[in-house]
Amino acid sequence: MRLLAFAVLALFAVTQAEEGARLLASKSLLNRYAVEGRDLTLQYNIYNVGSSAALDVELSDDSFPPEDFGIVSGMLNVKWDRIAPASNVSHTVVLRPLKAGYFNFTSATVTYLAQEDGPVVIGFTSAPGQGGILAQREFDRRFSPHFLDWAAFGVMTLPSIGVPLLLWYSSKRKYDTPKTKKN
């Protein structure tokens, strides 16, 4: 009986300790390939899985230096007054990589108040990890339709196909002419 009472008391203490807001945050790249000089779309998702609203939520991502990335639209530092329990918010930023090479996409920082008079809670988003930013020339070489290359290939193969065809056609015309009947 004492063990059962202790278990109920411990369970009650755990549920009381978990009151308040609890945020889960993710950061993801929406592009399949990151290319120098082309738009790179980042999406931040923040989920409140707690029992109360998260207050003064601030998302801050300092992992994109201005000398390597230009901001096309959106902001890397965003603030929400509150995020209701069992709800989520999404934020999208469009960046333009200015240099090619490998880049470490690290996590962003999320700070919030779990309860109105509680301490500031600091959390981090998921980190996409290291990724390569392709040079524009390399991307075009790999993924362009190569119309000029195919046209050059066609012009170069034309003599090897056309000359035998012309020889065959001239001999066919020479020997296949029907003889006219004399009346």
Curated annotation (Swiss-Prot):
Residues that span the membrane, as ranges: 147-167
Membrane topology (UniProt): Single-pass type I membrane protein
InterPro entries (alphabetical): TRAP_beta
Major subcellular location class: endoplasmic reticulum
Single GO cellular component term: endoplasmic reticulum membrane
Glycan-linked positions: 88
Keyword Transmembrane: yes
Subcellular location: Endoplasmic reticulum membrane
Record's keyword terms, sorted: Endoplasmic reticulum, Glycoprotein, Membrane, Signal, Transmembrane, Transmembrane helix
Topology Lumenal: residue spans: 18-146
Cytoplasmic face residues: 168-183
Pfam family, one: TRAP_beta
Signal peptide, first to last residue: 1-17
Record carries keyword Signal: yes
Complex formation: Heterotetramer of TRAP-alpha, TRAP-beta, TRAP-delta and TRAP-gamma. Interacts with STING1.
Family per record: Belongs to the TRAP-beta family.
Function comment: TRAP proteins are part of a complex whose function is to bind calcium to the ER membrane and thereby regulate the retention of ER resident proteins.
Designated name of the protein: Translocon-associated protein subunit beta
Organism: Bos taurus (Bovine)
Gene behind the chain: SSR2
